Structure formats: C-alpha cells, structure tokens
C-alpha cells in the first residue's frame, strides 16, 4: 500500500511542497526567509483576527477601542503589540528576502519574481491601511497625505481621491472601508503566496552558486524543516523581545494622540519600513514626479531579469557587483534615515543624492559592471 501522505490528494500537495521536496543541498540561511515570511503572515492573520473581535471602525470609538484592547481585554496588550511589531518583522524579512533574490539572481525565475513584486505591493497596501485604523494623529494625517498623492494623476486625480475617501476628507467612510480592506487583503496575500510557491516549485529553488543543482538535491524534511525551525525560533525571540521590552520602539508617539483634523503634527511620516520610499517621494519637487518616483522605486524590481547582462547568475563570484550591491544597501539605509528627518538643509540634498544613486546603481552601474566582469573573464 502506498504511503498515506503520497496517495491522499490533499496530503500529496503538502508532501510535495514541504516533505519530499527536492532541495539544493547548499542553500544558506538566506533561504530561510520564505518560511519566516509565511510564519509572519500566520502571526499577523491570527493576532489581527483577535484584534478585529474588539475593534470598532468608527471615528468616534476607534481610538478608544484600541485603548480598551490594551487595558481591558485579557492579554490584549500582547496581541496588539505582537500585531504592530509583527508588521515590522514582516518587512525586515521581506527586505532580506528580496535582497537575497537580487544578490543570488533568483529573479531569473520570472513568474515567481513577478508574483513576489505583486505580493510586496499587496503587503505594503495592507500595512498602510492597518496604520490608519488606531485613528491617532499619525494615522489620520498619514492617510490624508498618502491618499492625496493620487490627486497628482492628471484629469481623474481629484475625483479618484474623493472616491477613495468617500467624501471630501478622510472621515468615517474612509476608516470603515480601510478596515474592510485591511481585513480581506491578508487572505488575498495568502492566496498569492500559494501561487508564488506553485511557480517556485515548477523550477525548484535557486542556490548560492547560481548553478544548476539537479545533480545534488536532498529532501526538504528533515534537513530544511529543522533549519527553518531554528530560523523561526530566532524570529520569535526577536519579536517577543521587542514586544515585551520596548513595544513602542518603532512606533510614533504622535499616534497616542487621538486624530484631530484641526491640528497638523509638525513632522508627518509613515512607519519606518516606508521611509526609504517616502524619502524618494520627497526628493522630487514636483508632485506627479514624486509619485512616479515612489511607484518606480518598487516597480524597478521588475526590470532586474531584463538587465541581467552577466554570464553568471549569482553575485557569489562577482566582487565588483558585490561592492555595488552593498553600496545600494547602504543607500537604502541612508534613504530610510532621511525619510524620518524634517525637510530642511542638509537633509534635502542628501535625500536627492541618495535617490539619484538608488536609481543609478540599478539602471546604470550594475549592468555596466556586469559587462566589465564578462570582459575580465573573456566571456
């Protein structure tokens, strides 16, 4: 008789994805982030579900309902801070996962990569709408500023913004619909994750060398299940340390003030994981130009397979490209720092230089360097 896990229609899918999956034997810890992202999504959906049981999406009671969760609900404070800081862990894993893909040339799996970009946009939209829900000062003004960017779209912009708001300003209708979208989007993300995995398992995983690893595959279980569990323990340790020792470290103090449309906070800024894109947006004086730069700062990921000039897939054996990759990483840290600073000298010019450098490295320097490396190796 065939093994149950290999014969049952449902178990067969799980078996082929997580148990008997042939995996390259040399994948490093950078390949852990896929499973960590899955864990983050699970944590966010679970904690979010329990928060939604006590939250009210009304402008008059939203702020109070979050306070009520923290003060009166059993372990409500734990669920709330796990959800808020879980989002930060989610984005840390996302950035590292994308960085891994860029470094080792995983973007050559086009379908998997493109679904990944759609996933990134979906998760960013979810996080943005979630930030609006507590209805603090930064929630309200963040929602106002970011939705207002759509008014830069010619001809239909203003109508579009008012349609999204459900009125002439961010108000009750906006909060209610943002809650509805924030609730449904993670399930859409989960469905997209399935598609992401489906396409990945069509080709099999990449590996650090960037070479074909069909001759050296090992089963996913027990080798990588145990490796993923170690990663998961580290993730949970970091998350719980953050939640239990300094839950407000990554938050904004302004969000402990209830939303007031009549008083603008001195510095409106999004959560830390959007600051790099916010810095790029602000570095262009023109509104439409800024919005386009903001969108393309993420969409630029889609052109990576097209600008792969190097004969080698991975950067593992390409020291010049490695140097550029780490300069790009440092540039993103710089942009994140600038995004949190006020719009004044010298931050304006630093932000503009960092923005130009970001696009230049990807569009000009990386392809040029790949050409040079090919020539050096007489390819």
Curated annotation (Swiss-Prot):
Cofactor (UniProt): heme b
UniProt-annotated location(s): Mitochondrion inner membrane
Keywords assigned: Electron transport, Heme, Iron, Membrane, Metal-binding, Mitochondrion, Mitochondrion inner membrane, Respiratory chain, Transmembrane, Transmembrane helix, Transport, Ubiquinone
GO annotation terms (biological process): mitochondrial electron transport, ubiquinol to cytochrome c
Positions annotated to bind heme b b566: 97, 196
Recorded family membership: Belongs to the cytochrome b family.
Functional summary from the UniProt entry: Component of the ubiquinol-cytochrome c reductase complex (complex III or cytochrome b-c1 complex) that is part of the mitochondrial respiratory chain. The b-c1 complex mediates electron transfer from ubiquinol to cytochrome c. Contributes to the generation of a proton gradient across the mitochondrial membrane that is then used for ATP synthesis.
Protein name: Cytochrome b
Organism of provenance: Muscardinus avellanarius
